[in-house]
Amino acid sequence: MKQAIVARTDIGMGEGKLAAQVAHASLSAYQDAGRRVRKKWQGEGQKKVVLKGDSESQLFELADKADKEGIPYAIIRDAGHTQLEPGTVTALAVGPARDDTVDRVTGDLSLY
């Protein structure tokens, strides 16, 4: 089991902003997963990978694929208090779910 977090590279997030957005995405998708999935993922070490996304539209396309696969996912919008405009889509988390299922959604993306 794993979770993939896709962070946008086209909006110039600083390292701290990137870390916060990835964390928001991870926790949000985790909360949407079923109890069994959460427990299994926790028991297996909560494997995660952070991947590069190139646009808002790409994140929404990936979210649609995750939805069709029945995978928990979360799209994160920034509050706009620091670097970005309010409502800017920054990240997408896919999973936790089986590795092969997550890979069907995010397998073509590069590591961040």
Curated annotation (Swiss-Prot):
<dbReference type="GO" id="GO:0006412">
    <property type="term" value="P:translation"/>
</dbReference>
<dbReference type="InterPro" id="IPR023476">
    <property type="entry name" value="Pep_tRNA_hydro_II_dom_sf"/>
</dbReference>
<dbReference type="GO" id="GO:0005829">
    <property type="term" value="C:cytosol"/>
</dbReference>
<keyword id="KW-0963">Cytoplasm</keyword>
<dbReference type="InterPro" id="IPR002833">
    <property type="entry name" value="PTH2"/>
</dbReference>
<keyword id="KW-0378">Hydrolase</keyword>
<dbReference type="GO" id="GO:0004045">
    <property type="term" value="F:peptidyl-tRNA hydrolase activity"/>
</dbReference>
<dbReference type="InterPro" id="IPR034759">
    <property type="entry name" value="Pept_tRNA_hydro_arch"/>
</dbReference>
<dbReference type="Pfam" id="PF01981">
    <property type="entry name" value="PTH2"/>
</dbReference>
<comment type="function">
    <text>The natural substrate for this enzyme may be peptidyl-tRNAs which drop off the ribosome during protein synthesis.</text>
</comment>
<comment type="similarity">
    <text>Belongs to the PTH2 family.</text>
</comment>
<protein>
    <recommendedName>
        <fullName>Peptidyl-tRNA hydrolase</fullName>
        <ecNumber>3.1.1.29</ecNumber>
    </recommendedName>
</protein>
